[in-house]
Regions:
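Glycine-rich phosphate/adenosyl-contacting loop at the front of the ribokinase-like
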Residues: 1-59
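Short coil/turn connectors at secondary-structure junctions
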Residues: 31-33, 71, 82-84, 106-107
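Short hydrophobic segments within beta-strands
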Residues: 37-39, 76, 112-113
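Conserved beta-strand edge residues that scaffold enzyme active sites
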Residues: 41-42, 67, 144
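Short Asp/Glu-rich motifs
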Residues: 46-47, 71-73, 147
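A glycine-rich helix N-cap at a beta->alpha junction
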Residues: 51-69, 77-79
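Ribokinase/PfkB-type carbohydrate-kinase core domain
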Residues: 52, 83-150
Length: 150
C-alpha cells in the first residue's frame, strides 16, 4: 500500500506503509531475515513498493503481481495534532489473496495483519497456510514472514 499523507489539505509525502509493512521494514533494517507476502498491481506503485522492500533488506519474492489490478492506496489526512483520518482505495478484480507458500523452516515466525485476521474471504488461504506452517514448526531458529493486503 502506498500512503499519501496530507497536511492542511495538501499532499506532503507518499510512502509505502501499513502496520505489517512497517514492522517488516523495521526488521529488514535491523538485519533480520524477513520476507513479505502480499499482492500488488502491475503498476508503478507496485514496483515502487517492491523496490522499497528490497532496498530495506526485506525479501519481496512472495509479493504476487496481478496485471489486472491496481496497487492499493491510502490517503491519510492529518489534523492539527497529526492524527490521521484514512481513506483506502483498493482495486482488485479477484476476491481472494493468491500467493505461493514460501519456504518455512522450523522456528520461523509468521505474523498476519488485521486484514487477514478479520476478512472471511481470505480465511481459507490463511487457514491452509497456518496448517502448513504448523506441520514444520519445531526448533528455535527465527525468520519473519509477514502477510498483508498492501
Amino acid at each position: 500500500m502506498l500512503d499519501i499523507i496530507f497536511k492542511n489539505g495538501k499532499p506532503i509525502e507518499a510512502v509505502p506503509g501499513g502496520s505489517s509493512f512497517n514492522a517488516v521494514i523495521s526488521l529488514g533494517r535491523a538485519g533480520v531475515n524477513a520476507s513479505f507476502i502480499s499482492e500488488a498491481g502491475n503498476d508503478r506503485i507496485g514496483e515502487y513498493v517492491i523496490q522499497f522492500l528490497r532496498d530495506n533488506g526485506v525479501n519481496a519474492d512472495n509479493v504476487s503481481i496481478f496485471p489486472e489490478s491496481k496497487s492499493p492506496l491510502s490517503l491519510a489526512f492529518l489534523d492539527e495534532n497529526n492524527n490521521a483520518d484514512y481513506i483506502f482505495y483498493k482495486d482488485h478484480p479477484h476476491d481472494q489473496l493468491e500467493f505461493a507458500t514460501p519456504e518455512i523452516n522450523p522456528g520461523d515466525i509468521v505474523l498476519f495483519g488485521s486484514f487477514f485476521a478479520l476478512n472471511p474471504v481470505v480465511r481459507p488461504q490463511v487457514a491452509g497456510f497456518l496448517e502448513y506452517f504448523n506441520l514444520i514448526l519445531a526448533s528455535m531458529s527465527a525468520s519473519f514472514f509477514f502477510a498483508s493486503s498492501a
